[in-house]
Amino acid sequence: MSANMHIFENPSALAEALADDVGARLAAAIAARGTASLAVSGGSTPKAFFRSLSRRELDWSKVTVTLVDERFVPPENDRSNHRLVADNLLKDGAAEARFVPLYQAAETAEAAAAIASGRTASLGAPLDVVVLGMGTDGHTASFFPGGTRLEEALDPTTPRGVITMEAEGAGEPRLTFTFSSLQDAGYLVLHIEGSGKKEVLAQAEASGDEAEMPIRAMLRRAASPLQIYWAP
Ligand SMILES: O=C1O[C@H](COP(=O)(O)O)[C@@H](O)[C@H](O)[C@H]1O
């Protein structure tokens, strides 16, 4: 079992503890530099965590929130990660936070990625907190097995920023921060729930190619220790 494994009795206990830990990191960044940055994942797992975090007492006006990855769909779309964050995180005190979306109303995903790279550069580097998720295929962010630009996304020499990704398991074209943008976050979290994902994590921790299970790049090569939060 990983040295940085945080195990909870249930998803609500996890959501509260992760919100406490992320809130404390953001508060420390604000105290040190006057601002804080947070990149979160989409999908079904982070909803309860988002709701808990939105209630944490912080000077949210000094926090900038963005996404680790996004579908190339407008925020009105049910599958938009922007929409998930707007509905569950950017409320209560956290409504004061600045949100920088990855989706941009551009003609192509490539054009949107270029705009998103420029806009997210204002968050500075490294990011203070990054919360990753993981799919049962071993993807994290939009680093999908078989992804069109997986090699480039995982290459540590690829610059910080947002690139496009297409993959069979991804549905829509995606926008994703590169590995280099995420791996050195001040607090780097992997949030997973359920016995299925615990088994996937165990598989990822065993030997094998990063291309088969891209989460391995974070487990093996991230400059910051990956803090794994899990509940059944
Ligand atoms: O496609 C995505 O899926 C992963 C995992 O989602 P979940 O529904 O299994 O929690 C997520 O981390 C990523 O941000 C999202 O775009």
Curated annotation (Swiss-Prot):
Q: Which CDD domains match?
A: 6PGL (cd01400)
Q: Name one GO biological process term.
A: pentose-phosphate shunt
Alphabetized GO MF terms? 6-phosphogluconolactonase activity
Keyword Zinc in the entry? The reply is no
Catalytic EC class: hydrolase
Q: Iron: is it a keyword of this entry?
A: no
InterPro entries for this protein: 6-phosphogluconolactonase_DevB, Glc/Gal-6P_isomerase, NagB/RpiA_transferase-like, PGLS
Under the heading Pfam families, the entry gives: Glucosamine_iso
Catalytic activity as recorded in UniProt: 6-phospho-D-glucono-1,5-lactone + H2O = 6-phospho-D-gluconate + H(+)
| Keywords in alphabetical order | Hydrolase
EC number(s) per entry = 3.1.1.31
Q: To which pathway does this protein belong?
A: Carbohydrate degradation; pentose phosphate pathway; D-ribulose 5-phosphate from D-glucose 6-phosphate (oxidative stage): step 2/3
Could you list the residue ranges that cross the membrane?
none
Gene3D superfamilies of this UniProt entry? 3.40.50.1360
Q: What does this protein do?
A: Hydrolysis of 6-phosphogluconolactone to 6-phosphogluconate.
**Family classification:** Belongs to the glucosamine/galactosamine-6-phosphate isomerase family. 6-phosphogluconolactonase subfamily.
NCBIfam families assigned to the protein according to its UniProt record, in alphabetical order: pgl (TIGR01198)
Q: What is this protein called?
A: 6-phosphogluconolactonase
Q: What is the lineage of its organism?
A: Bacteria, Pseudomonadati, Pseudomonadota, Alphaproteobacteria, Hyphomicrobiales
